[in-house]
Regions:
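Amphipathic alpha-helical scaffolding segments comprising HEAT/armadillo-like alpha-solenoid repeats
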Residues: 2-3, 26-37, 56-68, 90-100, ...
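Inter-repeat boundary and helix-capping residues of tandem alpha-helical solenoids
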Residues: 70-71, 87
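Long, helix-rich interaction regions
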Residues: 1-15, 73-77, 99-153
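Structural detector for internal amphipathic alpha-helices that build alpha-solenoid repeat scaffolds
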Residues: 5-26, 35-56, 76-88, 107-118
Length: 153
């Protein structure tokens, strides 16, 4: 099997991607995560699509989503969210997001834009989080789109 370094340094190829996904599904949990994690760190554009197809355990998906919260910009954070939400569930994503309200407002701000739970019963909780965010950070603005804290005024 190829290494993550080899995988991300080659042009996209559907056959190769399918072979890697087949191997990942048969690999141990740790091997799957290790390969996907290294691929993500080297080239998120090629690594993120592996997240969903590798069928990772929720604990690994949390690590990946938290990384995406911090290192995904205002647009790409959506890719991290979409790659992990089916394995974590909307409620867990909302819990992870809510946990950042006090210390990482930039994460909450950029994710609230994309977060659309498929479970309509969660919509009141999402609205409540939006209200808390707006009350806590009434004039929130940031001159950057990655990291955890706002910059500027």
């Amino acid at each position: 099997m190829m290494s993550p370094e080899e995988y991300v340094n080659q042009p996209r190829d559907t056959k190769r991607e399918n072979d890697v996904c087949k191997w990942l599904r048969a690999a141990s949990e740790h091997e799957k995560f290790e390969f996907v994690w290294r691929a993500i760190r080297l080239n998120p554009g090629l690594g993120i699509p592996l997240v969903r197809t590798a069928q990772l355990r929720p604990v690994y998906l949390e690590v990946i989503l938290e990384h995406g919260f911090v290192y995904g910009d205002a647009s790409t954070v959506r890719l991290w969210y979409e790659a992990t939400v089916s394995g974590l569930g909307d409620r867990k994503v909302l819990q992870l997001l809510s946990a950042h309200l006090d210390r990482a407002p930039l994460i909450v701000n950029k994710m609230l834009y994309w977060f659309r739970p498929s479970d309509e019963r969660l919509l009141p909780e999402v609205q409540e989080l939006k209200k808390k965010f707006e009350a806590k950070y009434p004039n929130f603005k940031s001159s950057r789109s990655t990291g955890i804290h706002a910059t500027g005024t």
